[in-house]
């Protein structure tokens, strides 16, 4: 049966190639087109849910029919051909149903996409309109802000109050019936009144100028008359000199000071005479005065008989008191120490005025039993300074004059004979008493004319005027320089603590225009903290980290790179430059021991510091060194080779112009800045 049916079907396939079928195909195409358009309309009428149920049912029927055909064919009987044909026809019908459902699904999908696209276009149009409206709103807000911020010239004029305006201005200007209800007209009227008043004042000013010229002419005439009297007065004063000497009538304050100076101890007297002479000859801003009790000073030089009588009386009193109670050994030692450290009741005060109206007050004392001089210092400024945290020790009386001359820290006595005196009363060192007594600097002894030979210690040394005169000018200049440098550091530290490196206009040429690295931290640290830093060991071992120095820690950042700088500030700044030690935390920890470029950066600020001194007296050296460190960190990071294994842009793009990025086997970077060309090169 199957072979017969196949033979019957073959002619159908052959006939399909003829021309008559082409006409049929054309007609069927037109009918198909009609059906296609009818199916598009039919999509809107059909329920997708029912189509889905029909699809499931059709698939189940196809599965059932295929299973039945499979069962019938497996039986192999000859009577099942008709049943198979019927099921095949039913299957074809179901396939046509599936095709139709597929077409309907595609039509629905196309319509859904079209609707989605139309909705998206509407949303985009609305979004564009919204953005346009937002831009318009922003523009209007900016214009409104500009209008609100606009200030007219008349707003800068201080007009009289409304009460004064209506009470003093004439009705022709005030126009109260109009200006009371109109602020604009009121302002115009007040401006007219201001103009009228200024015209009147200008007229008065011209009258006052004319009167002033007349008065000046009268003053000039009287001055000429008085100047003609000056020679007569001078002759009268010259004639009265014998009378003044006869009556002992001092008219000058200097004469009184000279009288008081007679009671000064020899070292303070030498200081007073030499300082007064220096002030009169070289420095008019230096003022010299004497403080203290003259009566107590006179009591020290009583005649011996009186003193012996007093001593006998006091001995008798002491004998009576000793019978009552016996002082302990500790009390006796304390009394002996106080007596040994006793100061002379008179002291010499020097006020050294600097250019910025700051004054250095120096009070000189004389320890009578130790035969040494001490000094206490205090700095006052014309304007009260806001003391930064890191500038706490700059102007302190204990350290402001430390190491004015190298090694002269003023913590021990300059007189070798004092040590034997200290042993008798149990004083280990004078360091414990300097805050109360003052600092016995070596230059203080020289200003008093004292010189203590170390080879032959002497308890009593006579002062020498020539020694005081030879050191006076140099010491005064050093004192002024010290105060000015400390005040300059005081102001600079206030900026450094806020992350600002102040660079003056005179020093702008030392650095490129753009510096990306920035200072984020500037703090003071102790001597012990500095010695504990691992990257400062070579400074400590070299003996450059003394306890008289000041120590600071700076942190400079750019991106992920952090550069620590430990700074040693010598008391003799700026004649002695600061010393920097660096530690870079970026891709590991880098110091001068493991990175030659870090050593080169330290050399740039420590060795080549003269390029950064700026104009004399080089008070900008420290801030210029810090700014140079920021520039060096930029060069270090920008010239670092980029790892190609990491995608994306470089963290530090090269912005500095360098003639050559590396040199030598150690690949040294170009750290030298060349002005005005603006490029970096190797040294």
From Swiss-Prot:
Alphabetical UniProt keywords: Acetylation, Coiled coil, Cytoplasm, Differentiation, Isopeptide bond, mRNA processing, mRNA splicing, mRNA transport, Nucleus, Phosphoprotein, RNA-binding, Transport, Ubl conjugation
Basic and acidic residues bias (residue ranges): 22-42
This protein's record includes keyword Acetylation: yes
Subcellular location: Nucleus; Cytoplasm
Induction pattern: Up-regulated following CSF1 stimulation.
Modified residues (Phosphotyrosine): 225
Region (Interaction with CSF1R): 2-144
GO cellular component, one term: nucleus
Superkingdom as given in the UniProt entry: Eukaryota
Residues where N-acetylserine is found: 2
Covalent cross-link (Glycyl lysine isopeptide (Lys-Gly) (interchain with G-Cter in SUMO2)), residues: 153
Main location: nucleus
Disruption phenotype: Embryonic lethality seen before day 5.5 of embryonic development (E5.5).
Family: Belongs to the THOC5 family.
Quaternary organization: Component of the THO subcomplex, which is composed of THOC1, THOC2, THOC3, THOC5, THOC6 and THOC7. The THO subcomplex interacts with DDX39B to form the THO-DDX39B complex which multimerizes into a 28-subunit tetrameric assembly. Component of the transcription/export (TREX) complex at least composed of ALYREF/THOC4, DDX39B, SARNP/CIP29, CHTOP and the THO subcomplex; in the complex interacts with THOC1, THOC2, THOC5, THOC6 and THOC7; forms a coiled-coil dimer with THOC7; together with THOC6 and THOC7, plays a key structural role in the oligomerization of the THO-DDX39B complex.
Identification of the protein by name: THO complex subunit 5 homolog
Gene: Thoc5
């Amino acid at each position: 049966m199957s072979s017969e049916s196949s033979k019957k079907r073959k002619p159908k396939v052959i006939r399909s190639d003829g021309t008559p079928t082409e006409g049929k195909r054309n007609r069927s195409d037109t009918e198909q087109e009609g059906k296609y358009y009818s199916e598009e309309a039919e999509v809107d009428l059909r329920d997708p849910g029912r189509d889905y149920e029909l699809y499931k049912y059709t698939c189940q029927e196809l599965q059932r029919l295929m299973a039945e055909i499979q069962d019938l064919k497996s039986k192999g009987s000859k009577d099942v051909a008709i049943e198979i044909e019927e099921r095949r026809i039913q299957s074809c019908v179901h396939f046509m149903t599936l095709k139709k459902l597929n077409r309907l699904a595609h039509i629905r999908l196309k319509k859904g996409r079209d609707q989605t696209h139309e909705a998206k276009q509407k949303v985009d149009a609305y979004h564009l309109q919204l953005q346009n409206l937002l831009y318009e709103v922003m523009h209007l807000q900016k214009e409104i802000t500009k209008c609100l911020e606009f200030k007219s010239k008349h707003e800068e004029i201080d007009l009289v109050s409304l009460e004064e305006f209506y009470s003093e201005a004439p009705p022709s200007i005030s126009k109260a019936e109009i200006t009371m209800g109109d602020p604009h007209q009121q302002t115009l009227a007040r401006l007219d009144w201001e103009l009228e008043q200024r015209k009147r004042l200008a007229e008065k000013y011209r009258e006052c100028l004319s009167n002033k010229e007349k008065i000046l002419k009268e003053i000039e005439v009287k001055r000429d008359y008085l100047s003609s009297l000056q020679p007569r007065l001078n002759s009268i004063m010259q004639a009265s000199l014998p009378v003044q000497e006869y009556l002992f009538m001092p008219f000058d304050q200097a004469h009184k000071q000279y009288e008081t100076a007679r009671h000064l101890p020899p070292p303070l007297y030498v200081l007073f005479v030499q300082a007064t002479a220096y002030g009169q000859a070289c420095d008019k801003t230096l003022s010299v005065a004497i403080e203290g009790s003259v009566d107590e000073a006179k009591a020290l030089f009583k005649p011996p008989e009186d003193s012996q009588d007093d001593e006998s009386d006091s001995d008798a009193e002491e004998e009576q008191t000793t019978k009552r109670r016996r002082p302990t050994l500790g009390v006796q030692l304390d009394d002996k120490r106080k007596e040994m450290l006793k100061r002379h009741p008179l002291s010499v005060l020097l006020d050294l005025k600097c250019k910025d109206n700051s004054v250095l007050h120096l009070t000189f004392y004389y320890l009578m039993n130790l035969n040494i001089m001490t000094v206490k210092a205090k700095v006052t400024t014309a304007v009260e300074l806001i003391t930064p945290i890191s500038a706490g020790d700059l102007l302190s009386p204990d350290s402001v004059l430390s190491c004015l001359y190298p090694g002269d820290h003023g913590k021990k006595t300059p007189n070798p004979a004092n040590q034997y005196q200290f042993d008798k009363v149990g004083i280990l060192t004078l360091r414990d008493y300097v805050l109360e007594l003052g600092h016995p600097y070596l230059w203080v002894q020289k200003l008093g004319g004292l010189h203590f030979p170390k080879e032959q210690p002497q308890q009593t040394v006579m002062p020498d005027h020539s020694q005081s005169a030879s050191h006076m000018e140099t010491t005064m200049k050093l004192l002024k320089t010290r105060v000015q440098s400390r005040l300059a550091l005081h102001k600079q530290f206030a900026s450094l603590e806020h992350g600002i490196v102040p660079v003056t206009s005179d020093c702008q040429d030392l650095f490129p225009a753009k510096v990306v690295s920035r200072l984020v931290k500037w703090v003071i640290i102790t001597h012990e903290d500095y010695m504990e830093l691992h990257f400062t060991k070579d400074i400590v071992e070299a003996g450059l980290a003394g306890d008289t120095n000041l120590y600071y820690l700076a942190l400079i950042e750019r991106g992920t790179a952090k550069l620590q700088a430990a700074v040693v500030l010598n008391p003799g700044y700026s004649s002695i430059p600061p010393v920097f030690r660096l530690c870079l935390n970026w891709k590991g920890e880098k110091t001068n021991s493991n990175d030659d470029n870090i050593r080169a950066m330290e050399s740039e600020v420590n060795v080549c510091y003269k390029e950064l001194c700026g104009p004399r007296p080089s008070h900008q050296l420290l801030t210029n060194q810090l700014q140079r460190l920021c520039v060096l960190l930029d060069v270090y990071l920008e010239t670092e080779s980029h790892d190609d294994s990491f995608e994306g842009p470089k963290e530090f793009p090269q912005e500095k112009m360098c003639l050559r990025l590396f040199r030598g086997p150690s690949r040294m970077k170009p750290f030298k800045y060349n002005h005005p060309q603006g490029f970096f090169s190797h040294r």
